[in-house]
């Protein structure tokens, strides 16, 4: 990996608290980097890799349903985290390159090696997923609130 790529990866949720260790760098150096053109699907509901993707450069959109943009990803952002260790054969959304992108792909075996070599990265993964669970619980609260005012307050 290039120096700029290492800097970008060191800011992702796995390493943000402690930076890249030598062991982590050695594991990441064995992970593939894929390039995508503007408009190209990186992941789709039916065609995806069982890997966490870390955007090294470019910009991508997370799309749901009929092209509704849920999120915009930039360098250092990730996708595929929640679905990596599941048995589900479908990905939850589409990821499309808005600009040309380069993506580092960390497979489940690579992450397992990383977690064994770098406990802080494992904690970063757990923290990230815990944050997503809390976020989704807040959204559930919004949908199940007994009043319209309560739903709006929780939604905001």
Language-model region placement:
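Cyclic-nucleotide recognition modules
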Residues: 71-127, 134
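Polybasic "coupling" helices that flank or enter modular domains
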Residues: 116-156
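Local beta-strand/beta-hairpin segments that build beta-sheet-rich folds
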Residues: 42, 69-71
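Cyclic nucleotide-binding regulatory module and flanking cytosolic helices
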Residues: 1-38, 83-86, 117
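Short, small/polar residue-rich loop motifs at catalytic or cofactor-binding pockets
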Residues: 28-29, 47-49
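Glycine- and acidic-residue-biased ligand/ion/polar-headgroup-sensing regions
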Residues: 39, 50-61, 65, 75-77
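Short phosphate-coordinating micro-motif centered on Lys-Gly-acidic
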Residues: 41-47
